[in-house]
């Protein structure tokens, strides 16, 4: 028997053939290398030359590894279609067509006569369903009666075995479900609400080993909201299906109330100046007792180790309790999360809650939105801590996890919803929550939430049906940086009489962080980093780079040099991101190489060092990065590599940040700052502009120079924030 005699090699009476690929031929849940195969024009040729080509290669007529060419349905009715291992099948991409085959035979690895094939319709066989390994589905039709399986060796959207002969239409979802011997029976077609339209999908990853494994996101006959362009939630609507379900956090009381140890400089917070602008601001409080919180909240505050208010808490808590809108700007690690959670919980405990697990539609009273998955999960853990033992239930939803898991968490009862923008809009689009009861809308890292990355999503949110107007809800914004442009954008979200709280130097770095700048060329950075890390030893260190590829490259390099390192960035699966943070948090890997996805809000204990391997493009991002150390009165150190060829635009704002934080400024940096003309100290095309006071005062003192943070990030290197 010849090597290429495929038909004779397969015995239809034995168990299904499961091919074994080399380890690197399969990339897990993200699909495999076959799914990314692009076909040449000859591979997509249905004519005789195309067939002869593949017969010479050992494949039977009309088979290829390439992609099935896209065409209109009338071109498909009398022709066989080039597919994967058989007609109508493919390991690669397939174009847009309704896949109707009126004539011709579509065989897989073997032929099988059947009485079910009537009217010259095609049975679909092959490796994956679009046919299982043995049989495909009986009927194929456009619209909702699409073939039931679209699958794989393992049965994703179909299966390896026999496809269903009589697919069943799901009347609720407008989908036809097809089974398989090992099939999942999951829907193959999606209804957009009228029951007649098939939601076509194409592109990479449909069919092949392990199959599509995608999740169909549709509306319910109403508007279906799309997620943000930065890619955080796009996996819910295209590409491989997200199946990851994060493990639940520990439920024991000791784990819930595990808290950050305050540092030696915590008492210095009392000396920080605070400015409140706006009319009729309530007076600040000095102790938690003055807030008149309920006993349960006071007990939880004590268990969490809170004994003294930070400046942002002294001013923000009474303002929120008074029902005023607030924009608060305070340095990193100064307790902003507790500043808005405690008064919101106090109101809920006093006024009662509306959402419960016994209601069909959950209507949370509070929505908290943050730009990154890690930050929103951190806020949720704080909300769970302070609401312990109360009737208030906090829920967290974010991208990179199974959508069904998010929905299940919500339907069990949701009073406080912590979410990333993309997943939040998906849940709203699916009408899994109602917005009519919203009393509090909180934007954490608000400058990032309102810039060009997330601004459109936030505008969609406040214009959603049922969302109370800004006059009927309380809107709160918190961040360490509030550029002038962001303050102007915020007026669309806040009442006109909102209060502005500025704690210390707005946009300035924490003085508990010792900053050092080293002049290092691009090609000398790796060796310098290695030298520093070897001197540091096992002290916990975060290394920031600008691109996702470089994060993995540097992490691999350090591991090769026997330094335990992990990485986190937007291209890593959520499971991998959480594993990396866990390894770093618990000391398994003392070095974490990260991109901007980890720059904001992350509160990891005992981070002693931050190294800017690449300086960011904006000075406010620099402030957020170095704010991962020196938190809650603890001291830390930040080292930045300054490249003369790429970082000159940061010289002037960097000098200003160092000076304001009472740090030593290197002579070479001052020379660059004052010899380089950047129209930004007088208005720049690069850099950042901070407002040290409320912009409603008519004028503001600029702390640093540069370009507005509303500038769009580099689309090549931008993070998948959500």
Curated annotation (Swiss-Prot):
Comp. bias intervals (Gly residues): 150-162
Motif Q motif, residue numbers: 286-314
Modified residues annotated as Phosphoserine in this record: 220, 224, 720
Compositional bias annotation for Basic and acidic residues: 21-35, 66-78
Its EC number(s): 3.6.4.13
Domain Helicase C-terminal: start-end pairs: 528-673
Subcellular location: Cytoplasm; Cytoplasm, Perinuclear region
Region (Interaction with RANBP9): 226-245
Motif DEAD box, residue range(s) on this chain: 444-447
Location (main, coarse): cytoplasm
GO terms, biological process: cell differentiation; gamete generation; germ cell development; male meiosis I; male meiotic nuclear division; piRNA processing; spermatogenesis; transposable element silencing by piRNA-mediated DNA methylation
Entry binding sites for ATP: 330-337
Catalytic reactions of this protein: ATP + H2O = ADP + phosphate + H(+)
Entries under InterPro entries matching the protein: DEAD/DEAH_box_helicase_dom, Helicase_ATP-bd, Helicase_C-like, P-loop_NTPase, RNA-helicase_DEAD-box_CS, RNA_helicase_DEAD_Q_motif
Gene Ontology terms: cellular component: chromatoid body; cytoplasm; nucleus; P granule; perinuclear region of cytoplasm; pi-body; piP-body
Region (Disordered): 1-241, 702-722
Pfam name, any one: Helicase_C
Intrachain S-S bonds: none
GO molecular function: ATP binding; ATP hydrolysis activity; mRNA binding; RNA helicase activity
Described purpose of this protein according to its UniProt entry: ATP-dependent RNA helicase required during spermatogenesis to repress transposable elements and preventing their mobilization, which is essential for the germline integrity. Acts via the piRNA metabolic process, which mediates the repression of transposable elements during meiosis by forming complexes composed of piRNAs and Piwi proteins and governs the methylation and subsequent repression of transposons. Involved in the secondary piRNAs metabolic process, the production of piRNAs in fetal male germ cells through a ping-pong amplification cycle.
Annotated family: Belongs to the DEAD box helicase family. DDX4/VASA subfamily.
Record's protein name: Probable ATP-dependent RNA helicase DDX4
């Amino acid at each position: 028997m010849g090597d290429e005699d495929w038909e004779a090699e397969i015995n239809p009476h034995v168990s299904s053939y499961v091919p074994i690929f080399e380890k690197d031929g399969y990339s897990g849940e993200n699909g495999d290398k076959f799914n990314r195969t692009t076909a040449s024009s000859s591979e997509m040729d249905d004519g005789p030359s195309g067939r002869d080509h593949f017969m010479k290669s050992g494949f039977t007529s009309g088979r290829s590894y390439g992609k099935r060419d896209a065409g209109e349905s009338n071109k498909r009715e009398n022709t066989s279609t080039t597919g994967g291992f058989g007609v109508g099948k493919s390991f690669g991409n397939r174009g847009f067509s309704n896949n109707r085959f009126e004539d011709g035979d579509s065989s897989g690895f073997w032929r099988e006569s059947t009485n079910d094939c009537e009217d010259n319709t095609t049975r679909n066989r092959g490796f994956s369903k679009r046919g299982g390994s043995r049989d495909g589905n009986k009927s194929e039709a456009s619209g909702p009666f699409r073939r039931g399986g679209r699958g794989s060796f393992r049965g994703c959207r179909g299966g390896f075995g026999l496809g269903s002969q009589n697919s069943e239409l799901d009347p609720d979802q407008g989908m036809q479900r097809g089974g398989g011997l090992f099939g999942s029976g999951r829907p193959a077609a999606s209804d957009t609400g009228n029951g007649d339209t098939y939601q076509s999908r194409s592109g990479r990853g449909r069919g092949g080993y392990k199959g599509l494994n995608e999740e169909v996101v549709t509306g319910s006959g109403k508007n279906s909201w799309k997620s943000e362009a930065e890619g955080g939630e796009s996996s819910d609507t295209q590409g491989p299906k997200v199946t990851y379900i994060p493990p639940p956090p520990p439920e024991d009381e000791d784990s819930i109330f595990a808290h950050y140890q305050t540092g030696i400089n915590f008492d210095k917070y009392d000396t920080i100046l605070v400015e409140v602008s706006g009319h009729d601001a309530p007076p600040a409080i000095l102790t938690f007792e003055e807030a008149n919180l309920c006993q349960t909240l006071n007990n939880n505050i004590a268990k969490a180790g809170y004994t003294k208010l930070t400046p942002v808490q002294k001013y923000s808590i009474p303002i929120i309790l008074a029902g005023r809108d607030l924009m608060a700007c305070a340095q990193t690690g100064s307790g902003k999360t507790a500043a808005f959670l405690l008064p919101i919980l106090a109101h809920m405990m006093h006024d009662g809650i509306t959402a419960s697990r016994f209601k069909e539609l959950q209507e949370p009273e509070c929505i908290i939105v943050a730009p990154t998955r890690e930050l929103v999960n951190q806020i949720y853990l704080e909300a769970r801590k302070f609401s312990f033992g109360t009737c208030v239930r906090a829920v967290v939803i974010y991208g990179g996890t199974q959508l069904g898991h998010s929905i299940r968490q919500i339907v069990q009862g949701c009073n406080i919803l912590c979410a990333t923008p993309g997943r939040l809009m998906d849940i709203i689009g699916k009408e899994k929550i109602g917005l009519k009861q919203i009393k509090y809308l909180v934007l954490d890292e608000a400058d990032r939430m309102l810039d060009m990355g997330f601004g459109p999503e936030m505008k969609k949110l406040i214009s959603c049906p049922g969302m109370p107007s800004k006059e009927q809800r309380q809107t709160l914004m918190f961040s360490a940086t509030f550029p002038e442009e962001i303050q102007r954008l915020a007026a669309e979200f806040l009442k006109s009489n909102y209060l502005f709280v500025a704690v210390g130097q707005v946009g300035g770095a924490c003085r508990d962080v010792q900053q050092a700048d080293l002049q290092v060329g691009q090609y000398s950075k790796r060796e310098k980093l290695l030298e520093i890390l070897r001197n540091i030893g096992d002290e916990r260190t975060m290394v920031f780079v600008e691109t996702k590829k470089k994060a993995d490259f540097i992490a691999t390099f350090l591991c090769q040099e026997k330094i335990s390192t992990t990485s986190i960035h937007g291209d890593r699966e959520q499971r991998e991101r959480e594993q990396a943070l866990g390894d770093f948090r618990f000391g398994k890997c003392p070095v974490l190489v990260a991109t901007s996805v980890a720059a904001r809000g992350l509160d990891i204990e005992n981070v002693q060092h931050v190294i800017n391997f690449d300086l960011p493009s904006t000075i406010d991002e620099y402030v957020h990065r170095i704010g991962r150390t020196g938190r809650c009165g603890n001291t830390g150190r930040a080292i930045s590599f300054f490249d003369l060829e790429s970082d000159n635009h940061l010289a002037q704002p960097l000098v200003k940040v160092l000076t304001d934080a009472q740090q030593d400024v290197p002579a070479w940096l001052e020379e660059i700052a004052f010899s380089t003309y950047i129209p930004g100290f007088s208005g720049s095309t690069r850099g950042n502009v901070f407002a040290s006071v409320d912009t409603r005062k008519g004028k503001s003192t600029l702390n640093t120079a540069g370009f507005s943070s509303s500038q769009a990030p580099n689309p090549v290197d931008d993070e998948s924030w959500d």
